[in-house]
A protein has these predicted regions:
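Core dinuclear metal-dependent hydrolase active-site scaffold
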Residues: 44-63, 69
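Acidic, His/Gly-rich catalytic cores of divalent-metal-dependent hydrolytic chemistry
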Residues: 78-133
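Active-site regions of enzymes building and remodeling cell-envelope glycoconjugates
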Residues: 35-44, 66-69, 117-125
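Short acidic-hydrophobic surface loop/beta-edge motif
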Residues: 42-48, 92-95
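Active-site neighborhood of phospho(di)ester-bond hydrolases with catalytic His/Asp-centered motifs
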Residues: 19-25, 52-54, 69-75, 102-103
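Active-site environment of divalent metal-dependent phosphoester hydrolases
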Residues: 26-31, 59-60, 75-79, 108-112
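Phosphate/diphosphate-binding glycine-rich loops and adjacent basic-rich segments that engage nucleotide
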Residues: 66-71, 75, 81-85
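Core catalytic region of metal-dependent phosphoesterases/phosphodiesterases
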Residues: 1-46
Length: 133
């Protein structure tokens, strides 16, 4: 498609930049495309002290892991209630002491409502900005 062609043209202008992708269920391009785009594809990626994974369910709960995780997959959303029956939902960064879940960067995916705990921090994407909730 047109976007992938534009990306490949742009990528060829910056061949020394390193790009890594932790592949998820929406990353459906053939492996040959990622190779042509000079993108390193991983099932998970460890860059001390961080682990990058697609789905939090992929964490091995049986090990004592002190690393911090970044993931995607669930497309976190926060619901804010206003006066009366006003309800607004926003994609968000969902940050806990153990992990951060990144928002979906697409208007075509749904949102999974999160219920943050007191120690969690949420950053909602509102219009063209990011707001701490």
């Amino acid at each position: 498609n047109n976007e992938t062609d534009i990306y490949l043209q742009w990528r060829k202008q910056f061949p020394l930049f390193n790009f890594s992708l932790v592949k998820g269920n929406h990353d459906i391009l053939p492996n040959s495309w990622y190779e042509e785009a000079n993108i390193q594809v991983h099932q998970s990626l460890y860059l001390a002290p961080f682990n990058f994974i697609h789905d939090l369910n992929d964490i091995d709960q049986t090990i004592n892991n002190q690393n911090y995780y970044f993931s995607g997959h669930i497309h976190p959303g926060i619901q804010l209630k206003g006066m009366g029956k006003q309800n607004l939902r926003f994609p968000c960064f969902y940050c806990t002491p153990q992990f951060t879940v990144l928002p979906a960067f697409s208007k075509f995916t749904g949102l999974a409502n999160i219920k943050p705990k007191k120690e969690d921090v949420v950053f909602a994407i509102v219009n063209d900005g990011i707001v701490k909730i």
